[in-house]
Amino acid sequence: MDKIISFPHIGNYHVPIECLLKFIFTDCTVQAAPPITKKTLELGSKYSPDFVCAPFKYNLGNFIEALDEGANILLQAGGGCRYRYYGEVQEQILKDLGYNFEFIQIFSGNINLVTLYKTCRKYGSRLAFHQFIYYILLIIRMIRIMDKIESNIREKIGFEVKENSFENLHKKFLKELKTAKNFHSLNAINRKYRRQFGQLKINKPENCLKVGLVGELYSLMEPFSSFFIEKELAKNKIVVSRYTTLSYLLFEKSFKDRKFLKEAKKYLKFHIGADGTTSVAKSLMLARQGYDGVIHLKPFGCTPEVNAMPMLQNITKDYKMPILYFSFDSQTSETGIKTRLEAFYDMIIMRKEKIL
């Protein structure tokens, strides 16, 4: 039987992940799960425990869709919260549904290159270790390039002169990114699109509204799970800042938690788990930088982010900066989200006008 490897979606990171797996598993078929839709959430919710978090349901729905398209090896990555324990539950649910597959789990706090290389060899990789390291470094570079360009898009897309100019160029960028085979071609793509994005015309006022996004990583990085909240903000000509990216999670977070505790010592005495500490520290940073507001995103029942909320309320009190809280689950209404966003937008406009 041919090996078909698949993995769940999170933002646009299926592009570098798919590239990496194709480099490593040359004798296997690699395909990302189908793009997330309402059907994905419906499937995941149908077979998940009722009170499990939304990312679990999205991933389970992705796995079911991938298996239905022929995948027989599934890849799952765990994080710093209880989600790291969900892999076993998802595997058992899928096997109870009658699917036959192999399940590979990777935990972010327990990754080393030698173990990862041995795991890849076990599942059919023929790369020598130095080749494996080369492709890992190539994909790390790809992720950093992608995150930097997308951060630039978030800051400017709300002020584009020609409608959809940023989005259309972004799609071309992601498509061409898949063609990169080495550092030379990857850096050429980076230079090309940095230049092209820089040439897009924008009409950005001097005192534009600035809003930061903080919260749980999946709700921040997977736009479908938050009803494309970044696009909604951009429609109202708001600069959007989001610091939680794959680059940050992989290469910065573990080194910065102690620094964050020190910077936010008035509000935090201890690390509160997963992304909670980051949410508090980044909200404090945004308040000090004069941002007009912060939006806090989390799945329903996310313990670390629930722990962070009292500290965020204290930051609001001390800095007079409004924070809007959203919790997402399979029953969340898009209409309700948009209504609350409109009210938040009206409030920060009035606050801005009063200050100016």
Whereabouts are the PLM-identified features?
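An N-terminal assembly and electron-transfer interface module characteristic of large anaerobic redox
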Residues: 1-356
